[in-house]
Amino acid sequence: MTLPRSSRSVAVDGAQPYTITIAPGLLADGARLARHVRGRHALLLSDSQVAPHYAAGVRAALLSARPDLQIGELVIAAGEASKTLDTFGSAITALAELGATRDACVFALGGGVVGDLAGFAAACWMRGVDCVQLPTSLLAMVDSSVGGKTAVDIPQGKNLVGAFHPPRAVLADTDTLRTLPARELRAGLAEVIKYGAIRDPLFFQWLHAERHALLDSDPAALAQAIARSCEHKAEIVARDPLEKGERALLNLGHTFGHAIETEQGYGAPGNDNLNHGEAVAVGMVLAARLSATLGMSNAQDTEALRALLHDFELPTDIPPGLPPEALLARMRLDKKNIAGRLRLVLWRGIGKAEVVPDVEEAAVLKILAG
């Protein structure tokens, strides 16, 4: 199958280079899927929302190109609540029961939770097998499927147990966005906005101009947003694959956002808790407000960010019932911290993020208290 003219590809350079392909119809392209399976075993990991739409088609596409494949399947409950060590254990068991050898491949068919679990299982099985990311949510296409960060949550915090394991390929089939709930689309757009906020003022302006098209799931607008976001992440990941420096900038809003998610208990789909993208949206506003309080930026840029997020129908305030002290306690467990001191991604205005070490907790607590 040749790619349509609307397709785009982004190369991720580094010690383990790979390509992000963005196009409609990729999940039906058996030859393209199967070329990434070096051996005879493949595990297809998906969730209860995505699998009914796409799992059978992906399996059929793989077998049409590689009838010799032995394909195992694991379907987990949808939502962040499944990103646990127990579910990770289920993935490892599935690989064992499949008889997967070191040339096996794990296909991650779903959003960020599926991608994290599949990637972590692939990283650990026999000390590392291939993983192909098949993101079906906008958030996964522009963020979690790219870069090789894999992890699960524990009660004490989000993404505290994991590994760096770059995928063999990322195949982002934009047709899957047709079945994406509106709330999940908006969650992904929060991560898209982040790229404009941290390093691309022109992209920030473009997002404002195209906000109605993006919210209406216009294919051309979404393809452009995905490609530009992936280009930004690919550039950063290539220079800093293990997050020793610049890559931390991709976490604007995440320290605050992860604290909110953890304190709310990683709610299941359909409840009132914030999802990841929504929590990041709130976190970005909090980071911008803290930056202004510290004299790093101005109130106008903070308001521009808040207004853009609001225009995309995203939350910008901490949900009620979350004590500031409890959120601060969660933030103390963030992986970016050093020697027990808060280390946050803040900004000097639109397009100019930076990592700030040793942020005073009193200033953070004041922002959390509103």
From Swiss-Prot:
One of its GO terms (molecular function) is 3-dehydroquinate synthase activity. Its cofactor is Co(2+); Zn(2+); NAD(+). InterPro entries: Dehydroquinate_synthase, DHQ_synth_AroB, DHQ_synth_fam, DHQS/DOIS_N, DHQS_C. It catalyses: 7-phospho-2-dehydro-3-deoxy-D-arabino-heptonate = 3-dehydroquinate + phosphate. NAD(+) binds at residues 112-116, 136-137, 149, 158, 176-179. Its EC number is 4.2.3.4. GO terms for biological process: amino acid biosynthetic process; aromatic amino acid family biosynthetic process; chorismate biosynthetic process. Zn(2+) binds at residues 191, 254, 276. Gene3D superfamilies: 3.40.50.1970, Dehydroquinate synthase-like - alpha domain. CDD domains: DHQS. It is an enzyme of class 4 (lyase). Keywords: Amino-acid biosynthesis, Aromatic amino acid biosynthesis, Cobalt, Cytoplasm, Lyase, Metal-binding, NAD, Nucleotide-binding, Zinc. Pathway: Metabolic intermediate biosynthesis; chorismate biosynthesis; chorismate from D-erythrose 4-phosphate and phosphoenolpyruvate: step 2/7. It is found in: Cytoplasm. GO terms for cellular component: cytoplasm. HAMAP family: DHQ_synthase (MF_00110). Belongs to the sugar phosphate cyclases superfamily. Dehydroquinate synthase family. NCBIfam families: aroB (TIGR01357). Catalyzes the conversion of 3-deoxy-D-arabino-heptulosonate 7-phosphate (DAHP) to dehydroquinate (DHQ). This is 3-dehydroquinate synthase. It comes from Xanthomonas oryzae pv. oryzae (strain MAFF 311018).
